[in-house]
Amino acid sequence: MWNEFKKFALKGNVMDLAVGVVIGGAFGKIVSSLVSDVIMPLVGLLLGGVNFTGLSFTFGKAVVKYGAFIQTVVDFLIIAFSIFLFIKLFNKLTFKKEEEKKEEVPEPTKEEVLLGEIRDLLKQQNASKDRA
């Protein structure tokens, strides 16, 4: 059971996923800081000095912090757009590699050409026997 688990855990896909999760978590923190510390203060400044973190209203005893929600939406949009660009770049690079592989088809060797001619002759002979 232990050996089977080691095989599973050390597969390339599992390790890639683990690295992706760790990097994704760190990237999320960077984007959150970018949104809350850089983008939203600038947007607030452009809108007349609005501080989005303090935007809220009280409904009875409940406090609805819609400013924090707006920051979270902007945070999500930036992360989603970044992932979109990354996947688009990845697909573009992968597609180029596939095109290069298709272009690198080697020409048939003399033996392969000769075997192809023999195959064609045998097909012709079998076709003429079937007609007769």
Swiss-Prot record:
Belongs to the MscL family. One of its GO terms (cellular component) is plasma membrane. It comes from the Bacteria. This is Large-conductance mechanosensitive channel. The gene is mscL. Its main location: membrane. SUPFAM superfamilies: Gated mechanosensitive channel. Signal peptide: none annotated. Homopentamer. It is found in: Cell membrane. Keywords: Cell membrane, Ion channel, Ion transport, Membrane, Transmembrane, Transmembrane helix, Transport. It holds the Pfam family MscL. It comes from Bacillus cytotoxicus (strain DSM 22905 / CIP 110041 / 391-98 / NVH 391-98). The chain crosses the membrane at residues 8-28, 30-50, 67-87. It is a multi-pass membrane protein. The keyword Plastid does not apply. One of its GO terms (molecular function) is mechanosensitive monoatomic ion channel activity. Channel that opens in response to stretch forces in the membrane lipid bilayer. May participate in the regulation of osmotic pressure changes within the cell. PANTHER family: LARGE-CONDUCTANCE MECHANOSENSITIVE CHANNEL, MECHANOSENSITIVE CHANNEL MSCL. The keyword Transmembrane helix applies.
